Amino acid sequence: MNTESVVEFLGNVPLLQKLPSSSLKKIAQVVVPKRYGKGDYVVREDQTWDGCYFILQGEAQVSGPDEEDNRSEFLLKQYDYFGVGLSGNVHSADIVAMSQLTCLVLPRDHCHLLETNSIWQSDTSLDKCSLVERILQLDPLELNIFRGITLPDAPIFGKVFGGQFVGQALAAASKTVDFLKVVHSLHSYFLLVGDIDIPIIYQVHRIRDGNNFATRRVDAVQKGNIIFILLASFQKEQQGFEHQESTMPSVPDPDTLLSLEELRESRITDPHLPRSYRNKVATRNFVPWPIEIRFCEPSNSTNQTKSPPRLNYWFRAKGRLSDDQALHRCVVAFASDLIFCGVGLNPHRRKGVKSAALSLDHAMWFHRPLRADEWLLYVIVSPTAHETRGFVTGQMFNRKGELVVSLTQEALLREARPPKPSGTSKL
């Protein structure tokens, strides 16, 4: 087997799917293939185990259980594993090949590669990772189940931020797919408001695994209720036809524009803006976002000023990210909900009226590889709104003008109402 085939196999082993892709590559370089004939002992009860075994082909049986009902639980097949783990514990068991059997063995001296502090990086402690990477960090609880939390310095807007749902759910789905397959499309629905004070449980359902494509459904659960669902499709890189009709609009270079923090300071002292608005901005608690944003057309408009339903801005993650393409797509998914549906409110803003936008669904198509820690241009347009529902579309371009992501979202647009207790329907 070549290294790519080994990496692809390891990416389907449940034990290893919590690891960052860099760890899988290291494991692929040190595993040793071992072959056994039918009836051969893989290990004996009194034998010292060589390391952690991953079954590549064939089946094996753990000897001992005689009950017919339990026997299937001790039949080991492709992607199953046994042996020495992180604890170094030595197990006592006879394991016999039930057919021609091939195992990849991770030697004992390399079992430390099974340890990681982050699902995204193996060489960097979590506290040194970027904020957005820490927001997207999940704790694997058991096979296909992950736990996410809302960090104190994460965007919340009084409830769990929609982009956090999309990013964390996509992260959970990505950790159950071999890393040679990356997400190319996702469709999601926001069902209930998320509580920022309790963890979110992400339950991944493996809908399909093919040679080139895989499909996952993720349910986000709080207090026993499904509050968000995501369906994502993953594809292995393939060569094929290419064209691009969409053209990136002509906008200022991001290096010439003010950051969100600089723009805020400028607006506080701008006499062209209403005093009441400036005082409100100045006294409001400001928590910097994990995403750097630079508006292409800074203006003197406020949230009480009517404006066209369109917006262009550059964005990138604060801090350097690892090279894991899955992480970059999760970060872009997280960032994509920032200010997105609010553009649909622009034509309806007026003095004395507080308006609100609540995301109902969110869809994304990833066309090309991207880096979320490099500038991306987000072009947002809201073509229509009717019966309290606004529709927005988005395109993301890299600095070379390549279209990397397309997006759509429908949102509830209406005058603001008093907040309801968390766990109630968004509708």
Swiss-Prot record:
How is the activity of this chain controlled? Answer: Insensitive to feedback inhibition by free coenzyme A (CoASH).
Catalysed reaction(s) here are: a fatty acyl-CoA + H2O = a fatty acid + CoA + H(+); dodecanoyl-CoA + H2O = dodecanoate + CoA + H(+); tetradecanoyl-CoA + H2O = tetradecanoate + CoA + H(+); octadecanoyl-CoA + H2O = octadecanoate + CoA + H(+)
Q: Which BP terms in the Gene Ontology apply to this protein?
A: acyl-CoA metabolic process; fatty acid metabolic process; protein homotetramerization
UniProt-listed SMART domains: cNMP
- Active site: which residues? 337 (charge relay system), 359 (charge relay system), 409 (charge relay system)
A GO molecular function for this record?
medium-chain fatty acyl-CoA hydrolase activity
Q: Which residues bind a nucleoside 3',5'-cyclic phosphate?
A: 15-83
Please indicate the residue ranges that the annotation assigns to the motif Microbody targeting signal: 425-427
Pathway annotation from the record? Lipid metabolism; fatty acid metabolism
- pH dependence (record): Optimum pH is 8.5-9.0.
Give a Pfam family name: 4HBT_3C
Entry EC no(s):
3.1.2.20, 3.1.2.2
Query: Looking at the UniProt record for this protein, which Gene Ontology cellular component terms does it annotate, in alphabetical order?
Result: peroxisomal matrix; peroxisome
Which SUPFAM superfamilies does the entry mention?
cAMP-binding domain-like, Thioesterase/thiol ester dehydrase-isomerase
- Function according to Swiss-Prot or TrEMBL: Catalyzes the hydrolysis of acyl-CoAs into free fatty acids and coenzyme A (CoASH), regulating their respective intracellular levels. Active with both medium chain and long chain acyl-CoAs (e.g. 12:0-CoA, 14:0-CoA, 16:0-CoA, 18:0-CoA, 16:1-CoA, 18:1-CoA, 18:2-CoA and 20:4-CoA) as substrates, palmitoleoyl-CoA (16:1-CoA) being the favorite substrate.
The family line of this record is: Belongs to the C/M/P thioester hydrolase family.
Q: What is this protein called?
A: Acyl-CoA hydrolase 2
Q: What lineage does the source organism belong to?
A: Eukaryota, Viridiplantae, Streptophyta, Embryophyta, Tracheophyta
